[in-house]
UniProtKB/Swiss-Prot annotation:
Name the UniProt record assigns to this protein: D-amino acid dehydrogenase
EC number: 1.4.99.-
Organism: Escherichia fergusonii (strain ATCC 35469 / DSM 13698 / CCUG 18766 / IAM 14443 / JCM 21226 / LMG 7866 / NBRC 102419 / NCTC 12128 / CDC 0568-73)
Enzyme class: oxidoreductase
Pfam families registered for this protein in UniProt: DAO (PF01266)
Family statement: Belongs to the DadA oxidoreductase family.
Gene3D superfamilies reported in the protein's UniProt record: D-Amino Acid Oxidase, subunit A, domain 2, FAD/NAD(P)-binding domain
InterPro entries: DadA (IPR023080), FAD-dep_OxRdtase (IPR006076), FAD/NAD-bd_sf (IPR036188)
Record gene name: dadA
Length: 432
């Protein structure tokens, strides 16, 4: 089958890889000159299935009000003048109760755990290298309340069979030695030993090279004007004066998917602006070993080979990509506070990207009401974590194979009234 994929970020390229491996004739189209040059370029670097959780959580509405008056707030909102933004925020608020949070987190963890398994298999099969580490991740708590709240997330981890360790502050240095000097500032941490890290852009670029060698065609520097359709079927992609045709079409345009699908399929994917710093390592003993997540500021600090990636925050501000100095100051503040000797902060590279977010936090993966249109978008801050699993899942569905995990509650149909997904089975695993 001829398949056209729109988008060459990590989700688009993994989709291309798995579809090609399934025997399809795949073409990837992107406006950029190469893969992973937008949202996948400089994310936080975490592959953290256990921390997969929606921003829509109990207490967030009240916290959002408090954050409006804080200098280093993890979430900021600025109206962009569109009804879509208001509708999206209302939908997000409706998902902030405990019941929705547990449901959404459960399916996010399910896909993320599966995705990590797919990444392991891909790494074993291809030998792909991307400055990856398999040292686990550590969520850091600064208050007793945060430590107590971790029990809520642990219930979801146990249900999914995800290994974890709940550590008091005096044990944090066992997994991240440099934290010994700042342990007095912390109340503890939640460690997920099976989580990983890696450079998402490097992974995507190298997988794109492998995919091209396997026969995937990449059409870079090719802006897409619109999808052409008749009835309930897509019959082409209009790119300037050219119409590119295929048997099936996959939308993986991230935050730009919503506008491209206007009048075809209604999806609630909105850009969630985030920032990162990439810092050269200055002191091996003072740098992170793997990756940590600061629960207070929602900022991740991740170790690559000779670099430290500091990423996080969320701004609901539309398609604004301005680099704001106060956001850089927040990233610098957190990394100086936890790893004061770790990196040459004065040499850091500052970056921003637009994460494609759904109001319930779960991506949109699978078929649509159109016979030959498929979606793989809306992964929010977890595109790197969920990419391989989403790509394999999409390939299985499109190819008519039975996927390894339940998937009906990942489709766009879940936003329809009366939708009732099948209950997912437990994932294998143990906890301690």
């Amino acid at each position: 089958m001829r398949v056209v994929i729109l988008g060459s970020g990590v989700v688009g390229v993994t989709s291309a890889w798995y579809l090609s491996q399934a025997g399809h004739d795949v073409t990837v189209i992107d406006r950029e000159p190469g893969p992973a040059l937008e949202t996948s370029a400089a994310n936080a670097g975490q592959i953290s299935p256990g921390y997969a959780a929606p921003w829509a959580a109990p207490g967030v509405p009240l916290k959002a009000i408090k954050w409006m008056f804080q200098r280093h707030a993890p979430l900021a909102v600025r109206l962009d003048g569109t009804q879509f933004q208001l509708k999206w925020m209302w939908q997000m608020l409706r998902n902030c109760d405990t019941s929705h949070y547990m449901e959404n987190k459960g399916r996010m963890v399910r896909l993320a755990e599966y995705s990590r398994d797919c990444l392991k298999e891909l790494r074993a099969a291809t030998g792909i290298e991307y400055e990856g580490r398999q040292g686990g991740t550590l969520q850091l708590f600064r208050t007793e309340q945060q430590f107590e709240n971790a029990t809520r997330d642990i219930a979801v981890l146990e249900d999914a069979g995800v290994p974890y360790q709940l550590l008091e502050s005096n044990r944090l240095a066992e997994v991240e030695p440099a934290l010994a000097a700042v342990a007095h500032k912390l109340t503890g941490g939640l460690r997920l030993p099976n989580d990983e890290t890696g450079d998402c852009q490097l992974f995507t670029q190298r997988l794109a090279q492998m995919a091209e060698q396997a026969g995937v065609k990449f059409r870079f520097n090719t802006p897409v004007d619109k999808l052409l359709f008749e009835g309930e079927q897509i019959y082409g992609v209009k790119c300037g004066d050219e119409v590119i045709k295929a048997d099936a079409y996959v939308m993986a345009f991230g935050s730009y998917s919503t506008a491209m699908l206007k009048g075809i399929v209604d999806i609630p994917v909105y850009p969630l602006k985030g920032y990162s710093l990439t810092i050269p390592v200055a002191n091996e003993d003072g740098a992170p070993v793997s990756t940590i997540l600061d629960e207070t500021y929602k900022i991740a600090i991740t170790r690559f080979d000779n670099r430290i990636r500091v990423g996080g925050m969320a701004e609901i501000v539309g398609f604004n990509t301005e680099l704001l100095q106060p956001r850089r100051e927040t990233l610098e503040m957190v990394v100086r506070d936890l790893y004061p000797r770790g990196g040459h902060i004065e040499q850091a590279t500052f970056w921003t990207g637009l994460r494609p977010m759904t109001p319930d936090g779960t991506p949109v993966v699978g078929r649509t009401s159109f016979k030959n249109l498929w979606l793989n978008t809306g992964h929010g801050t977890l595109g790197w974590t969920m990419a391989c699993g989403s790509g394999q899942l999409l390939s299985d569905i499109l190819s008519g194979r039975t996927p390894a995990i339940p998937y009906d509650d990942l489709s766009v149909a879940r936003y329809s009234s009366g939708f009732s997904p099948a209950r997912p089975r437990h994932l294998h695993g143990v906890h301690n």
